[in-house]
Amino acid sequence: MKKLAFAITATSGAAAFLTHHDAQASTQHTVQSGESLWSIAQKYNTSVESIKQNNQLDNNLVFPGQVISVGGSDAQNTSNTSPQAGSASSHTVQAGESLNIIASRYGVSVDQLMAANNLRGYLIMPNQTLQIPNGGSGGTTPTATTGSNGNASSFNHQNLYTAGQCTWYVFDRRAQAGSPISTYWSDAKYWAGNAANDGYQVNNTPSVGSIMQSTPGPYGHVAYVERVNGDGSILISEMNYTYGPYNMNYRTIPASEVSSYAFIH
């Protein structure tokens, strides 16, 4: 899905150790498809504003293949070493991380990471410890696929939704799951209609990986369905619902309320 291009590399299987001087030096990062300034800032333990200042950017837009200078320390991790190829290790999940981010950091695929930890879904929680498999093949870049109804348009767009908003988060979450969507569906309240126009199945029945959409408020809201429970309730992940922009949380929707939402498959 997403891959990182680091200026610091490991040779002959040896781990590359960062000195204090290296940690403060500027690092060159090549933007990958689906990345945003916020996700890059999180990986390098810096801020969006710092990256914008270092690169004289007037807005938050970045494009695949663009090389940017990233100040501050190297990507967040539990140590200051790059994971050694062929060696098993563990990783403690940090707030805001996803399986794709972690897999890219350690050079393994999401499928390998899920298999090593017996995960049946993409849901992980902060402070959860994950085992990193030996000798991974590296993450893969998201590719366009058809929707679940077989008639949806294919997309491999850059995320142009406003960073930190629910739409921005759900766009990235679907890309991580291998089911990319359009970056031109506008505000959340328009998503169901625009998705239907693009050929996606839209109904009131949730499924894992579908997008939950509601229209109240000036912009509406969207969330990602992580799990459908046996009692008919659903677990969703979302951003900018309770704690403001860039804050992701999980929420359970009672079975009695599920049918009041639209679901994009």
UniProtKB/Swiss-Prot annotation:
InterPro entries reported for this sequence: CHAP_dom (IPR007921), LysM_dom (IPR018392), LysM_dom_sf (IPR036779), Papain-like_cys_pep_sf (IPR038765)
Gene Ontology biological process terms, A to Z: cell wall organization; defense response to bacterium; killing of cells of another organism
Record keywords, A-Z: Antimicrobial, Bacteriolytic enzyme, Cell wall biogenesis/degradation, Hydrolase, Repeat, Signal
Entry keyword Membrane: no
Entries under Pfam families matching the protein: CHAP (PF05257), LysM (PF01476)
Highest classification ranks of the organism: Bacteria, Bacillati, Bacillota, Bacilli, Bacillales
Main function: Has weak lytic activity toward S.aureus cells.
Name the record gives this protein: Probable autolysin SsaALP
Cross-referenced SMART domains: LysM
Signal peptide: 1-25
This protein's record includes keyword Hydrolase: yes
CDD domains: LysM
Domain LysM: 27-70, 89-132
Domain (Peptidase C51) ranges: 141-265
Biased composition, class Polar residues, residue ranges: 74-92
